[in-house]
Amino acid sequence: MTAGVSRRALLIGGAFCVSTISRSIAATRVEIEQFDANGVSTGVAALDKIVKSDAEWRAQLSPRAYDVMRHEGTERAFAGPYWDDHADGLYRCLGCETALFDSKTKFDSGTGWPSFYAPASKHNVVETVDSSFGIRRTAVSCARCDAHLGHVFTDGPRPTGLRYCINGVALSFAPRGAKETAR
């Protein structure tokens, strides 16, 4: 009977380990909608999550971008890039170049931050509850590298009524039709 219990425990333990490893491997992949240089979707692909050490992020990002993207900081209003930019193209994550917002959804919110009424794809952003500073908000981050981008509010224009208030320092801009960078 002892051998039966041991075998059962071994099988259960082994199944648990396989299940845990499978979930862990799945958590390292994420579905990202990809866009060509003209902003046209080329489909959704399962891509590896971008995971870097703190030292690697510090080396890649400016101090201000590092604070915003890795520690949920906020740039000063009217001080960051893109708040008053009207060029046609895609706004991408500075950390991993994932397409986040299209200039076609950008609007002047008067807040001093780049504002959009919709992301380029719901696959490419993650929204989570942020209760810091004693207020309940919805934080927005990049789905591929977990970079903090900003917050989304329900005071935006039609057609969504949403305002994605994004830190410009967390973005890069690719003019529509520009040759894509590989990353």
Which residue stretches match the model-derived regions?
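A short Gly-Trp-Pro
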Residues: 38, 49-52, 58-60, 68-92, ...
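Short charge-dense sequence patches
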Residues: 7-11, 40-48, 93-95
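N-terminal secretory signal peptides and thylakoid transit peptides that target proteins
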Residues: 1-17
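Compositionally biased, intrinsically disordered low-complexity segments
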Residues: 8, 21-24, 35, 128, ...
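C-terminal segment of N-terminal export signals and the immediately downstream linker at the start
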Residues: 21-60
